[in-house]
Structure formats: structure tokens, C-alpha cells
Design a protein with these regions (language model features):
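Conserved beta-strand signature within the Rossmann-like core of class I S-adenosyl-L-methionine
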Residues: 236-244
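Conserved AdoMet
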Residues: 2-105
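Conserved class I S-adenosyl-L-methionine
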Residues: 100-114, 135-137
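A short glycine-rich, Lys/Arg-flanked "PGG" loop and its adjoining helix->strand segment in the class I
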Residues: 224-236
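Extended basic-aromatic, gly/pro-enriched interface segments that bind polyanionic ligands
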Residues: 127-210, 214-218, 222, 248-249
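Core SAM-dependent methyltransferase catalytic element
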Residues: 253-317
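Conserved SAM-binding loop of SAM-dependent methyltransferases across substrates and taxa
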Residues: 111-129
Length: 318
């Protein structure tokens, strides 16, 4: 790839996704763009860049999505996950017993493993909170990643990344060479496409936002914009999780590190007097995160006759 084409592409990614690349990451861009032009049958990178310069929004969106990072796994960083499940989550539950409502947001969720892992932890702690209003939202810039997350279907390699045999059998149903998320877990989680540079209009308040190994790819000014936005939709003393050893220089403006907890920060709730806007679950036709809900895949198949009863029970509310 020519230097001018590389520079054009990294500027394109910066403007449309906020990601910061430099010359040391040339091979990452080169590999991803080579896969894209092969998949889309472009003769060369130069031909693709020439078309991008015309300004096709649809093509720009496709290129940006093809560059999205998808490194994820279930129960990622086991020590961090166990600390969340066994220490922080019980405290969050205790603090919400009066309202009986919990909201979680996996931001930059890729193909859904992180959001489902939150649901796994909740499932383990459901004794006494079975009738609570519980919802886990997962968002990502990649529509392909979101489509996979919505299916809740993973191959053998994917489920073995972070899960032991007992957990696989507890949270999945075997379908040939794949594993499908069980209905009781699936009903807790919703996925939507969201570009982290887009405005965010919602009056939903999140108890926990998980944004692990995502902000490190953004330019510093975009990191600050994103943290300012998400801190505005957190509950008082809401929790933010970053990646293990992830350093974000502007984090202290909006969050403070929780002593004794890896990667966990408490929201300072700067500017809580801001006006509340639309509820994410009811607003449509917006350029913000508030998008029309997706149609869930049919999970009531003949192969799984017990699934219908699980859905009819209606234990979990959106």
C-alpha cells in the first residue's frame, strides 16, 4: 500500500470512528484493507481509495466496519470477571433493592461474548432478585458483529475461550458443532449498532458500563468526549470497567479508581443537572443510540421444546 493511501485511510478512520493509528500499525491496516478489497473484488487499494474520495457514505461505513477490532472472549480476564461477579455485583444488587432494577451496558461488545458474560454472572446471583427488571445492552460499531451477537450462536473454539465444560453446559445448548445461548440468558440481553462518536440521547441510567480495551484505540480528544457522554448516563456512583492495564489519561475527569478492584472506576457524575431526553427503549428514527429494536431470531424450534416455556414465564422484563 502506498504511503498516501495509508495516510488517507487512517484519516478516514479517525474522522468516522475516532480511532488513532500511526505508521507502526501499518501492517494492521494493510492486512484488514487487503481482506476488504479481496472480499469486495476491488482491483487494488488505489481503486478503493479513489472511490472513497468521491464520498460514498455507504462505502465509508463498510470500510470503517471492516477495520473494527473483534478480539473478545467469554469471561475475559478471569480474575477481573470473578471479582466483578463475586464482590462488586452483590454490592450493586444490595444498593438497588428498593428500585429492583439493574442496567448494564457493554460498550464495544464485538460479537457479544462480554455482554453474555454479564448475564452469566447475573444468573448466578438471581436468588432473591428473580422478579427484578434486569437488562444488559451490548453495542458495537460493526453491524456484522452485532448480527452474530444477536444470534447467540458460537462454535466450539469460541465457547472454550474463557469457559469450562460445566459453564458451557449450563449456559448453552448444543446444536451440532455450535452452541446456542440458553433462552433465560438470551432474554436478558439486547444488541444494537452504535458508533461511539455519535450523540447519545437516553434517560436510561446504567449501574455498570463495560468498555474494556476499546478507548485505547481512540485519539485523546475522542476519549474525553466518550467518557463525558457515558458518565452522563450512569447512576450515582455507577461503575465503569476498562481493560486490564488499559491507560486512559483523561479518566480522572469523570471517574475515580475503586481501591482494591482491577479496572473498576466509580463515576463522579459531573453535571447531573443536565436535561433528560428520550428513553432508549421507546425512541426511534433518531441519529442517536435510540434505534428501533431488532427482530430476534426464532428460538422456539422443534429441537428445543422446553424453550417455549422459558419464554412464556416472562421472568425478566425489558
Amino acid at each position: 500500500m502506498k504511503k498516501q493511501d495509508f495516510e488517507f485511510l487512517i484519516n478516514l478512520l479517525r474522522q468516522n470512528a475516532g480511532w488513532e493509528f500511526d505508521e507502526e500499525q501499518y501492517f494492521i491496516i494493510d492486512k484488514k484493507i487487503s481482506n476488504f478489497i479481496r472480499e469486495k473484488s476491488y482491483p487494488s487499494v488505489e481503486d478503493l481509495v479513489a472511490e472513497l474520495k468521491v464520498g460514498s457514505r455507504a462505502l465509508i461505513a463498510q470500510v470503517v466496519e471492516s477495520m473494527a477490532f473483534s478480539d473478545t472472549s467469554f469471561c475475559r480476564d478471569y480474575d477481573v470477571y470473578e471479582q466483578f461477579k463475586d464482590v462488586l455485583l452483590p454490592r450493586i444488587i444490595d444498593n438497588n433493592r428498593s428500585g429492583k432494577k439493574l442496567r448494564f451496558w457493554s460498550l464495544g461488545c464485538s460479537t457479544g461474548q462480554e455482554a453474555y458474560s454479564v448475564a452469566f454472572a447475573l444468573k448466578k446471583k438471581l436468588i432473591g432478585i428473580e422478579n427484578w427488571d434486569i437488562h444488559v445492552l451490548g453495542t458495537d460499531i460493526s453491524s456484522l458483529a452485532i448480527a452474530k451477537a444477536q444470534k447467540g450462536l458460537y462454535n466450539n473454539f469460541e465457547v472454550q475461550m474463557g469457559l469450562n465444560a460445566n459453564s458451557i453446559l449450563e449456559f448453552f445448548i448444543s446444536e451440532g458443532e455450535h452452541w446456542r445461548i440458553t433462552p433465560d440468558i438470551y432474554e436478558l440481553v439486547e444488541f444494537r449498532r452504535y458508533n461511539m462518536l455519535d450523540r447519545l440521547t437516553t434517560n436510561v441510567q446504567y449501574d455498570v458500563i463495560i468498555c474494556r480495551n476499546v478507548l485505547r484505540y481512540f485519539a485523546p480528544e475522542y476519549q474525553e468526549q466518550i467518557l463525558a457522554r457515558i458518565s452522563q448516563v450512569q447512576t450515582p456512583n455507577g461503575i465503569l470497567y476498562l481493560g486490564k492495564n488499559e491507560q486512559v489519561s483523561v479518566i480522572d475527569k469523570f471517574y475515580e479508581r475503586i481501591n482494591g478492584f482491577d479496572c473498576a472506576y466509580m463515576c463522579k457524575n459531573v453535571g447531573l443537572d443536565r436535561p433528560r431526553l428520550h428513553d432508549i427503549s421507546t425512541t426511534s428514527g433518531s441519529e442517536s443510540l435510540a434505534m428501533p429494536s431488532f427482530v430476534r431470531p426464532n428460538m422456539l424450534s422443534e429441537k428445543r421444546p422446553f424453550a417455549a416455556e422459558a419464554f412464556k414465564a416472562g421472568v425478566f422484563k425489558k
